[in-house]
Curated annotation (Swiss-Prot):
Principal subcellular localisation of the protein: nucleus
Sequence ranges assigned to domain DDE-1 in this UniProt record: 169-399
Family (UniProt): Belongs to the tigger transposable element derived protein family.
Alphabetic keyword roster: DNA-binding, Nucleus
Gene3D superfamilies: Homeodomain-like
Protein known as: Tigger transposable element-derived protein 7
Gene Ontology molecular function: any one: DNA binding
Domain of life assignment: Eukaryota
Name of the gene this protein is made from: TIGD7
Localization, UniProt: Nucleus
Signal peptide interval: none
DNA-binding region coordinates: 28-48, 101-132
Entry-linked SUPFAM superfamilies: Homeodomain-like (SSF46689)
Lineage: Eukaryota, Metazoa, Chordata, Craniata, Vertebrata
């Protein structure tokens, strides 16, 4: 690149290139020479790296239009701008073309919602809005209203087949991922707990929702860590470093996937994990590393143009709208298998094996206490273990319809409704019916992303930047010690559990140490606390022991 004048301003695309050179370890002088910039401009770009990257990441197509845009400053009416752009992204993801007049009308509506009486969605505003978000004045690419869903499947198969041949992709390089809801604390209606405690009826429990994302390759040899979206940051009861958790956990107030969360996962997790798998497990040469990720068209997914690795060899492709149930591999028994396995583990932890002498009151009390103990940490680890146990053949079979037009073979041995009925009956849950079990097993089939209404978008923009929910309170050391004492008595009296004695004893000693430390700190704090003094002393004048003036 030719040298520029000293005060030449770089556009966003050029700034991104400068940042990539810095990341690659290029020297200050070589970057200055390539882009013709001064030392101060170089350091300004380096200092504003996060601002530049965040701005580009938020765009619908990161570098489309970036060659013209030079600033990352926001709009005067930021709330209106954010709301309109969120609305536009939803329409675009659904394949709905959006004209300029519709953007202006949406802006006027959101301005009224925010009480912006002086806002005008003028032609100038429209021009600036499109420029800010790199939205071209082009026709929409939505599917024709009258075309049936099935008619879209075959052209997609042909296009996919062509890409596979052109890119020379093998099954291990084809990936599919999909979102789903998980009502992690859900129990069947009419269970002991739901009849006993009015705070725990089936419908209430069902509101304990997480969103999950599963992704694997076509031969089932590479299953990526599942993403879990929860309502708040992980509680303090989950002591593990989040990087060591068996899932990727992200907080989101509405428990929905967003474009920002998905983009972050794609570039920080999917791309590097795929590279590592192909280089270290498949032993591919670096130049042979490539992958194609197939996704649904939903508001949580950015455009395919923006979901592309820097070298262009790891890409995304979207299924035609409304064809997910027909050809999306994850919906051909993979997600269902994972959920059935999860329900099994949940029952094992949540249900109580009742004694024959227990009456209905005792059964209800035990059931409620057990379900209350089942927490988000248990759900996360059980979900991760369930995903690990989904069979490779289950994933491979799920691609049969898409790739070979064959009906996939489902293997739900041990995961049918009757299998769950058996364990429920063993735990004394005789009042639940088979229909209750079916509703419970199939009750969380919704997607993990949502089309927001105008009110929902407004609410999200208003609440953006709000504080995360408070984390759960810490346990009392005295209560923990009491529980350990009780467990030690049980272990010492039960031969088959005596091997756990020293582990529990070690925990007990640590708790006692913490109790003593807590008391010492409390006493020191009391000793150091300033003593009250006479208020008159605070306003007393200087000493009069010296000479009088």
């Amino acid at each position: 690149m030719n040298k520029r004048g000293k005060y030449t301003t770089l556009n966003l695309e050029e700034k991104m290139k400068v940042l990539s050179r810095i990341e690659a370890g290029r020297s200050l002088k070589s970057v200055m020479d390539e882009f013709g910039i001064s030392k101060s401009t170089f350091y300004d770009i380096k200092k504003n790296k996060k601002l530049i990257l965040d701005f580009v990441l938020k765009q619908d197509m990161p570098l489309v239009g970036a060659e013209k845009r030079k600033r990352t400053t926001g709009a005067k009416y930021g709330d209106v701008d954010d709301a309109v752009y969120m609305w536009y992204q939803q329409k675009r993801s659904a394949g709905v073309p959006v004209r300029g007049v519709e953007l202006q009308a949406a802006a006027e509506r959101f301005a009224r919602c925010f009480g912006r009486t002086d806002f005008k969605a003028s032609t100038g505003w429209l021009f600036r809005f499109r420029n800010r978000h790199a939205i071209g004045n082009r026709k929409g690419c939505g599917e024709q209203v009258l075309s049936s869903v099935s008619e879209n499947v075959e052209p997609f198969r042909q296009k996919l087949s062509m890409i596979i041949k052109e890119e020379k992709l093998c099954l291990a390089q084809l990936y599919s991922g999909d979102e789903t809801d998980l009502f992690w604390k859900s129990m069947p209606e009419n269970s002991q707990a739901s009849r006993k405690d009015i705070c725990l009826p089936g419908k209430k429990i069902n509101k304990e929702r997480l969103s999950a994302f599963l992704c694997a390759n076509a031969d089932g040899t590479h299953k990526l860590k599942s993403i879990i979206i929860g309502k708040s940051k992980l509680p303090k009861s989950v002591k593990e470093d989040t990087s060591t958790l068996p899932v990727i956990y992200k907080p989101s107030k509405d428990v929905w996937f967003t474009r920002e969360l998905f983009s972050e996962w794609f570039f920080q997790n999917f791309v590097p994990e795929v590279r590592h798998f192909q280089l270290n497990v498949l032993r591919f040469h670096d130049e042979d590393v490539r992958a194609l990720l197939l996704l649904d068209s939903c508001p949580a997914h950015p455009s395919s143009e923006s979901l592309t690795s820097e070298d262009g060899r790891i890409k995304c492709m979207f299924f035609p709208h409304n064809t997910s149930t027909l050809i999306q591999p994850m919906n051909q028994g993979v997600i269902l298998s994972c959920k059935r396995l999860y329900r099994w583990k949940q029952l094992e932890e949540s249900l109580v094996i009742f004694e024959e002498s227990d009456d209905e009151q005792e059964k209800g009390d035990k059931g409620v206490s057990k379900i209350k103990i089942y927490n988000i940490k248990s759900a996360i680890f059980n979900w991760a273990k369930s995903w690990e146990e989904v069979k490779q053949i289950t994933i491979a079979n799920a691609w049969e319809n898409l790739l070979y037009k064959k009906e996939p073979e489902y293997d739900f041995q041990g995961l049918e409704h009757g299998d769950y009925r058996e364990i429920l009956e063993k735990c004394g849950e005789l009042e639940t019916k088979l229909d209750d079990d079916r509703v419970w097993l199939n009750g969380d089939e919704e997607k993990g992303c949502l089309l927001k209404t105008k009110g929902g978008i407004t609410k999200e923009v208003v609440q953006k930047g709000g504080e995360a929910e408070k984390q759960t309170a810490e346990f009392k050391l005295s209560a923990v010690r009491e529980s350990l004492d009780y467990l030690l008595d049980f272990v010492d009296a039960t031969p088959e559990f005596q091997r756990f004695h020293f582990t529990l004893k070690e925990m007990q000693q640590e708790i006692v140490k913490k109790q003593f430390q807590s008391k010492i700190h409390s006493r020191i704090g009391s000793f150091l606390k300033p003593r009250p003094h006479n208020i008159k002393d605070s306003f007393s004048g200087p000493s009069t022991s010296g000479s009088n003036h």
